[in-house]
């Protein structure tokens, strides 16, 4: 009898722990998102816009690949490889449909620190005479790409470790002001690093703490050595790039295909330099020989991993943060979701695997992602199509870029960072919404330009956490027990009864970046129907212990509170008396929820708001100004809801 029970128990245990086919299928779809969207791909509707976007993206990938390879202190051809392989891997594992992975200015700048430290220019004379069998490049160039590949490999390993540890859930610590300040500061660093090419000045590599200021000090000390030809070429290139891109932006709705000004400029500059022999006549620095083809894979030098650990952490964190911000932005814009942890896996593999193929560190770039938006890309097929054209450049067109001036590439880098640099304009909205966030932005930016992007990011996160922890103890929490979530029978003027549901929800905590995502999720759980009506909402039923929201039924969250609002006859009253303070992320979440509810025909009213909250929400969002949404009390809001219903019924009756 005991043996039979034991056997039965072992059979049940085996069934519980044997993975089912459906579970394996779901796991594969979760870890390989391409298996989810590729079978559903609509060739008729999506192939044409994806093809056009892919061609335009290829132009950007080639131009930025050459530019960011130079920024990373390696041969330009390795930037072309970095524009090819990471894009393919991200298309398989990534969830951002409009995220264009490839070479990236910030990660290139970070890896350049390791390259210049371990393989400085002073060692060039020792290796320049000995050419390797790899693409005919010198041992010096191969040593440099070896260091950059090692940074990419170790950075990708760090991202994969973060994926295994499920650290994607910790990304809520990365607030919008911190990310904005860090990327703006890093973009300022990148522009500074290109000054020597823009001015044609020969200068040593300068990095480290306060290196930003040392570079400009060196430039001013050697201002007389500025090369006039390079300066004029740079000014002309920047003017053309800015002017044409602004015109493309202004008329993008009227023209089907924007002018690929980067490609046109590269061709025109190379042709002009070739015809006038500027390299020999004026000493203008050009890209030089670009070999065609792809070399066989080679492992990065593992013996230097400990020496590049600092840069690898910088690449892992900065690259992931910048890429995740773009993925979340595209997801919000086009109404789909992105798994923060899956992005760790996608970007980790996009760095580890290409490191064996002579690639520099990769990440998503704002300019390329914005290009996919503007050209109407639908899926990652656009990125895969761009890889085909990048491959053509690698095998056929690359050698023709010999005469491309370095100052033109530097101009492309600088103009390509415009989207990051104009984030200075965010300071005004931070000042109007939350002055503490304004202070965090300024301090994070200063730390970034004084030290490095990863240092600035770390400072911003620590500073933000410290401020929130300092504010939370002073926060007042409100628990109202005498209000109920009610089904009201509203009698209209025509003595007709219409059932209207009014949900009264109290916000019981400050609304800041730490809890904004949870607030949004809990509120939407109350509003939206669940696919399984019999499944209780655990998070809502436990809201008294661990959530921001209290759906008020004698102070308790019950299953009734989880019933969805009717899409036509539902009003939501948010009691904000417990919202004692907020930050920019909290305000943006509140406004976005309001607009989302409005699009679902759910009327939202806010009661007991502080003057600062009303001012911040009015400044931030395009709120409905035709009817009031802010009220002094909950009864006042309910009174308006009843009045609006009576007026609506009276109007309907008069029309009949």
Swiss-Prot record:
Query: Which cellular component terms (GO) are annotated to the entry?
Result: apical plasma membrane; basolateral plasma membrane; lateral plasma membrane; membrane; recycling endosome membrane
Annotated membrane topology: Multi-pass membrane protein
**Which GO-annotated molecular functions does the record name?**
bicarbonate transmembrane transporter activity; chloride channel activity; chloride:bicarbonate antiporter activity; monoatomic anion channel activity; oxalate transmembrane transporter activity; sulfate transmembrane transporter activity
Outcome of gene disruption: Mice develop goitrous congenital hypothyroidism, with enlarged thyroid gland and severely reduced T4 than T3 in the serum and thyroid gland. Animals fed a low iodine diet show more severe growth failure than those fed a normal diet. Develop distal renal tubular acidosis, manifested by metabolic acidosis and alkaline urine pH and in the stomach, stimulated acid secretion is significantly impaired. Retinal pigment epithelium cells (RPE) from Slc26a7 KO mice have a dramatically smaller whole cell SCN (-) conductance compared with wild-type RPE cells.
Relay the activity regulation note: Regulated by pH. Activity inhibited by all inhibitors of several anion channels and transporters, including 4,4'-Di-isothiocyanatostilbene-2,2'-disulfonic acid (DIDS), diphenylamine-2-carboxylic acid, glybenclamide and 5-Nitro-2-(3-phenylpropyl-amino)benzoic acid.
| Membrane-crossing residue ranges in chain numbering | 76-96, 145-165, 167-187, 200-220, 223-243, 255-275, 307-327, 344-364, 384-404, 405-425, 449-469
Q: Which Pfam families match?
A: STAS, Sulfate_transp
Q: Which domain of life is it from?
A: Eukaryota
Cite the residue spans of the region called Membrane targeting.
641-656
Please tell me where this protein is predominantly located: membrane
What ranges are annotated Cytoplasmic (topological domains)? 1-75, 166, 221-222, 276-306, 365-383, 470-656
The reaction(s) annotated as catalysed by this protein in its Swiss-Prot or TrEMBL entry are: chloride(in) = chloride(out); iodide(out) = iodide(in); bromide(in) = bromide(out); oxalate(in) = oxalate(out)
Instruction: Give the GO terms filed under biological process for this record.
Output: bicarbonate transport; chloride transport; gastric acid secretion; gluconate transmembrane transport; iodide transport; monoatomic anion transport; nitrate transmembrane transport; oxalate transport
Location in the cell reads:
Basolateral cell membrane; Recycling endosome membrane; Apical cell membrane; Lateral cell membrane
Query: Do the record's keywords include Transmembrane helix?
Result: yes
Domain (STAS) ranges: 492-641
Describe tissue expression: Expressed in the Reissner's membrane epithelial cells in the cochlea (at protein level). Expressed in the retinal pigment epithelium (at protein level). Abundantly expressed in parietal cells on the glandular portion of the stomach. Lower levels are observed in the kidney, with expression in the proximal tubule and thick ascending limb of the loop of Henle. Also expressed in distal segments of nephron, in extraglomerular mesagial cells and a subpopulation of intercalated cells of outer medullary collecting ducts. Expressed in the thyroid gland.
- The chain's Extracellular topological domains, given as residue ranges, are 97-144, 188-199, 244-254, 328-343, 426-448
UniProt record similarity statement: Belongs to the SLC26A/SulP transporter (TC 2.A.53) family.
Q: What does this protein do?
A: Acts as an anion channel mediating the transport of chloride, bromide, iodide, nitrate, sulfate, gluconate, thiocyanate and bicarbonate ions. Its permeability towards bicarbonate is weak and increases when pH is above 7. Mediates oxalate transport. Mediates thiocyanate transport in retinal pigment epithelium cells. Mediates iodide transport in the thyroid gland, playing an important role in the synthesis of thyroid hormones and the maintenance of thyroid function.
Q: Which PANTHER family match?
A: SULFATE TRANSPORTER
For this entry, the protein name equals Anion exchange transporter
Give the lineage.
Answer: Eukaryota, Metazoa, Chordata, Craniata, Vertebrata
- Record gene name: Slc26a7
């Amino acid at each position: 009898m005991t043996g039979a029970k034991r056997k039965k128990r072992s059979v049940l245990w085996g069934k519980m722990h044997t993975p089912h086919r459906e579970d394996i299928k779901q796991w594969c779809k979760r870890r390989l998102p391409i298996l989810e969207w590729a079978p559903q791909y609509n060739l008729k509707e999506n192939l044409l816009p994806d093809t056009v976007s892919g061609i335009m993206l290829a132009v950007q990938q080639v131009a930025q690949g050459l530019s960011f390879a130079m920024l990373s202190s390696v041969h330009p051809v390795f930037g072309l490889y970095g524009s090819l392989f990471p894009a393919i891997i991200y298309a398989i594992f990534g969830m951002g449909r409009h995220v264009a992975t490839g070479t990236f200015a910030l990660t290139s700048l970070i890896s350049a620190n390791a390259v210049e430290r371990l393989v400085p220019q002073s060692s060039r004379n020792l290796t320049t005479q000995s050419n390797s069998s790899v693409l005919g490049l010198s041992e010096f160039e191969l040593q440099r790409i070896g260091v950059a590949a090692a940074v990419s490999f170790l950075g990708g390993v760090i991202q994969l470790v973060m994926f295994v540890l499920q650290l994607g859930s910790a990304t809520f610590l990365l607030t919008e002001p911190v990310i904005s300040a860090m990327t703006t500061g890093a973009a300022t660093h990148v522009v500074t690093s290109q000054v020597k090419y823009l001015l044609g000045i020969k200068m040593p590599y300068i990095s480290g703490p306060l290196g930003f200021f040392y570079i400009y000090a060196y430039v001013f000390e050697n201002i007389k050595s500025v090369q006039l030809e390079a300066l004029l070429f740079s000014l002309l290139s920047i003017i053309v790039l800015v002017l044409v891109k602004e015109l493309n932006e202004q008329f993008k709705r009227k023209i089907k295909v924007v002018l690929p000004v980067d490609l046109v400029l590269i061709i025109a500059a190379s042709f002009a330099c070739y015809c006038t022999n500027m390299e020999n006549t004026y000493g203008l620095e050009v890209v030089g020989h670009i070999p065609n083809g792809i070399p066989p894979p080679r492992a990065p030098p593992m013996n230097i991993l400990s020496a590049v650990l600092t840069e690898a952490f910088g690449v892992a964190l900065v690259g992931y943060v910048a890429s995740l911000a773009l993925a979340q932005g595209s997801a919000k814009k086009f109404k789909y979701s992105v798994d923060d942890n899956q992005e760790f896996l996608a970007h980790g593999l996009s760095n580890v695997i290409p490191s064996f193929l002579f690639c520099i560190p990769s990440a998503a770039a704002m300019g390329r992602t914005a290009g996919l938006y503007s050209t109407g890309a639908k899926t990652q097929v656009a990125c895969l199509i761009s890889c085909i054209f990048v491959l053509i450049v690698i095998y056929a067109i690359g050698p023709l870029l010999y005469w491309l001036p370095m100052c033109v590439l530097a101009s492309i880098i600088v103009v390509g960072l415009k989207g990051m640099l104009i984030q200075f304009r965010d300071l005004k909205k931070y000042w109007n919404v939350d002055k503490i966030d304004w202070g965090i932005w300024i301090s994070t930016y200063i730390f970034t330009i004084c030290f490095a992007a990863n240092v600035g990011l770390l400072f911003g996160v620590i500073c933000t956490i410290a401020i929130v922890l300092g504010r939370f103890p002073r926060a007042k929490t409100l628990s109202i027990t005498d209000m109920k979530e009610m089904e009201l029978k509203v009698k209209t003027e025509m003595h007709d009864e219409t059932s209207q549901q009014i949900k009264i929800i109290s916000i019981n905590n400050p609304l800041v970046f730490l809890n904004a995502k949870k607030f949004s999720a809990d509120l939407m759980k109350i509003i939206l129907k669940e696919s399984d009506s019999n499944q209780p909402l655990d998070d809502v039923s436990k809201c008294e212990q661990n959530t921001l929201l209290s759906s008020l039924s004698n102070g308790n969250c019950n299953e009734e509170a989880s019933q969805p609002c009717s899409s036509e006859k539902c009003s939501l009253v948010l009691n904000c008396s417990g919202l004692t303070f907020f930050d920019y992320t909290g305000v943006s979440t509140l406004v976005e929820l309001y607009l989302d509810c409005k699009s679902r025909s759910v009327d939202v009213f806010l009661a007991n708001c502080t003057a600062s909250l009303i001012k911040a929400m009015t400044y931030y969002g395009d709120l409905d100004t035709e009817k009031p949404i802010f009220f002094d009390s909950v009864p006042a809001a309910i009174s308006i809801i009843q009045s609006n219903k009576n007026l609506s019924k009276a109007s309907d009756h008069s029309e009949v």
